[in-house]
Curated annotation (Swiss-Prot):
GO terms for molecular function: rRNA binding; structural constituent of ribosome. SUPFAM superfamilies: Ribosomal protein L22. HAMAP family: Ribosomal_uL22_B (MF_01331_B). Gene3D superfamilies: Ribosomal protein L22/L17. It comes from Rhizobium etli (strain ATCC 51251 / DSM 11541 / JCM 21823 / NBRC 15573 / CFN 42). It comes from the Bacteria. The keyword rRNA-binding applies. This protein binds specifically to 23S rRNA; its binding is stimulated by other ribosomal proteins, e.g. L4, L17, and L20. It is important during the early stages of 50S assembly. It makes multiple contacts with different domains of the 23S rRNA in the assembled 50S subunit and ribosome. The globular domain of the protein is located near the polypeptide exit tunnel on the outside of the subunit, while an extended beta-hairpin is found that lines the wall of the exit tunnel in the center of the 70S ribosome. GO terms for cellular component: cytosolic large ribosomal subunit. NCBIfam families: rplV_bact. The keyword RNA-binding applies. This is Large ribosomal subunit protein uL22. Belongs to the universal ribosomal protein uL22 family. InterPro entries: Ribosomal_uL22, Ribosomal_uL22_bac/chlpt-type, Ribosomal_uL22_bac/org-type, Ribosomal_uL22_CS, Ribosomal_uL22_sf.
Length: 129
C-alpha cells in the first residue's frame, strides 16, 4: 500500500472544497473540470449553469462550497476569486453483472470519482497578467 500522501497545504489566499465519490467516470468529470480551470468564479458558475453535462450540477455545488469556504473561513474577497485548480481523482469502481443470453453474464463497471476545487484570491495586477 505504501505511505499515505501528504495533503497539499493551502496558502493564505486560497480555499478549497472536495466532492467525494461522485457517480461519474473520472474522464467525463475532467471534461467539466477543465472547462472552469483558471477562470474567474462568476464566469465559471455561469458556464456550469448552462452546461449540458449531467455532472455540471455537482461541480457547480462544489465550486459554490469553495467560494463559501473562502468567504466564511478564510475572509477572502469573493469578487477577486479565480479557480486556481480543479482536479479529478479516481475512486472506487462498482462491479455489477448483466444477464446475457444462454445463461451467460457480462460485467458492468460503474466508476466513481473525486473532485477537488481550489479557489485563489488575486489582486488587480495579477488579473491583467
Amino acid at each position: 500500500m505504501g505511505k499515505a500522501k501528504a495533503e497539499r497545504r493551502l496558502k493564505d489566499n486560497e480555499a478549497q472544497a472536495v466532492a467525494r465519490t461522485l457517480r461519474v467516470s473520472p474522464q467525463k468529470l475532467n471534461l467539466v473540470a477543465a472547462a472552469i480551470r483558471g477562470k474567474k468564479v462568476e464566469r465559471a458558475l455561469a458556464e456550469l449553469e448552462f452546461s449540458r453535462k449531467r455532472i455540471a450540477g455537482a461541480v457547480k455545488k462544489t465550486l459554490e462550497s469553495a467560494i463559501a469556504n473562502a468567504e466564511n473561513n478564510h475572509d477572502l474577497d469573493v469578487d477577486a476569486l479565480v479557480v486556481a485548480e480543479a482536479y479529478v481523482g479516481k475512486s472506487i469502481v462498482m462491479k455489477r453483472f448483466h444477464a446475457r443470453g444462454r445463461g451467460r453474464a457480462s460485467r458492468i463497471e460503474k466508476p466513481f470519482a473525486h473532485l477537488t476545487i481550489v479557489v485563489r484570491e488575486v489582486q488587480a495586477a495579477e488579473e491583467a497578467a
